[in-house]
Amino acid sequence: MNIHALLVNRFTEALQEMGVENAPVPVSRSARPEFGEYQFNGAMALAKQLKQKPRDIAEKIVETVKLDDIASKLEVAGPGFINVHLNDAWLANQCELSLTDPRLGIAKSPEQNIVVDYSSPNLAKEMHVGHLRTTIIGDAVVKVLEFLGHNVIRQNHMGDWGTQFGMLLAHLSDKLQEEVAETALSDLEDFYREAKVRFDEEEGFADRAREYVVKLQGGDAQCLALWEKFIDVSITHSEEVYDKLNVSLTRKDIMGESAYNDDLANVISDLKTKGLAVEDQGAQVVFIPELADKEGNPAVYIVQKSGGGYLYATTDLAAMRYRSGKLNADRTLILTDARQALHFKQTEIVGRKAGFMKEEQTYEHCPFGMMLGSDGKPFKTRTGGTVKLVELLDEAVERAGKLIAERDNDLSEEELKEVARKVGIGAVKYADLSKNRTTDYMFNWDSMLSFEGNTAPYLQYAYTRVKSLFRKAGVDMATMPVDIKLVEKQEHALAVLLMQFEEVIGMVSREATPHVLCTYLYDVASAFMTFYEACPMLKEGIEPQVRDSRLALSALVAKTLEKGLTLLGIETLEKM
């Protein structure tokens, strides 16, 4: 059920009946409950066109619009706002329909092919905290899009190519004289550090490293076999992180930089043929007048170095062409940090001019801010090094275990381990997902593991509280009677929120903003707590019909929280 879309349709029909065509139909949620749940704000914009006072137009719309089945009251307020108060019986019926629907009343969207490029770690090193945001925001967006019925193609654009691999392969070749690759590469950070020290300090090693680059790029069989072994072990490290994070990426989603190697020369050739790429100081560049500086100098987009080497720009153009052509993507979403915003803006302009995309295909860079430490600087170890993601997640589980052990619970040792895992990982993910992705945020263990406020533990606890309620009532959620009556204001407020789930999911799918879903789930959990205190269910003297109605509403809360958290990639618990 999408109340917003329903109201837009009804107001559009009313305006057409009044002879007003193609007018904007601004419907928004009301700021305060006394103004109803929704508000139509279009009368003021029509005043000039209709040569009438906004309030008179609003009165006419109220007379014309057909909302008797939905609204208990329509009122004109201020200069011409129309406040919509939703009908309790209609709301109750919508809640009943949602409760008996596996999709909770959320309709599927017209199917699109949507490519989502996310995670994309550099395989020369282990995944670190800088990979957290792209991985979990991307995966949440993917899950929402798939839930809405889209054909989503995950693209893990892993950094598996480049000059640094010459240094790494030369070092690996030496290490394999004494140990197997899995042992040699058990700690990629240490391995990278050792190779870098040798490159900087050991006589002759840098030359060997450069030879390996030439061999690798030339397709030398022995060198490629060594490279494949390195990549295989590195991907296994990434898979360990994906498994801990409960994200849906698999090996079949990998489309690394090397996958585009064969097309890079064609990209340059096509850019030259179309008069876009020109030589400048030996390099091939595209000038972009659309992004000129204040002096009118066009932006310079380098696609091939003077020595003939290719750049990220070349690979990203090849990826654009592959996704738009071979994969036939209606939308391409790319999740990287905000520092790459200009690069992707340039890539889109050049790619569209080159005809690598159709006009109707979208290319959406979804930038995100950085994770900061308590000092307000990028999150690091105490010694200033990068924090391995796997170590951060292990610490989260350990901290969660200690916190839960301190609380009153009847959990067995095995249950405690499982609860600690779900709470710890959920806390890290939710702390990130709940922030607007375009802003930086400060990492804080205490706030993210709190059982109060907008946190994963609070939402997981709210879910277990509903499940506990049903255990105490001796009622099976799957077979319970579904007959909802909304009498108290807390019941009404909770029902309105529950019926806004589809609006929220739609917003996340359009804008790639999981924080909107987090805020919604927190609002639902908070409204449930208020409802739970004001509307008792298991007290003596509560009429069976009232009890059953409130339990049904509680069941819809549980299903909404479970579905919402699942879409965010966060697991729920039966008890904690």
UniProtKB/Swiss-Prot annotation:
Keyword terms of this UniProt record: Aminoacyl-tRNA synthetase, ATP-binding, Cytoplasm, Ligase, Nucleotide-binding, Protein biosynthesis
The UniProt record lists the keyword Electron transport: no
Cellular component terms (Gene Ontology): cytoplasm
Annotated CDD domains: Anticodon_Ia_Arg (cd07956), ArgRS_core (cd00671)
Places the protein is found: Cytoplasm
Record's catalysed reaction(s): tRNA(Arg) + L-arginine + ATP = L-arginyl-tRNA(Arg) + AMP + diphosphate
An example Gene Ontology biological process: arginyl-tRNA aminoacylation
Motif ('HIGH' region): 121-131
PROSITE patterns associated with the record: AA_TRNA_LIGASE_I (PS00178)
Gene Ontology MF term list: arginine-tRNA ligase activity; ATP binding
EC number(s) per entry: 6.1.1.19
UniProt family annotation: Belongs to the class-I aminoacyl-tRNA synthetase family.
Oligomer status and interactors: Monomer.
Protein name: Arginine--tRNA ligase
Primary gene name: argS
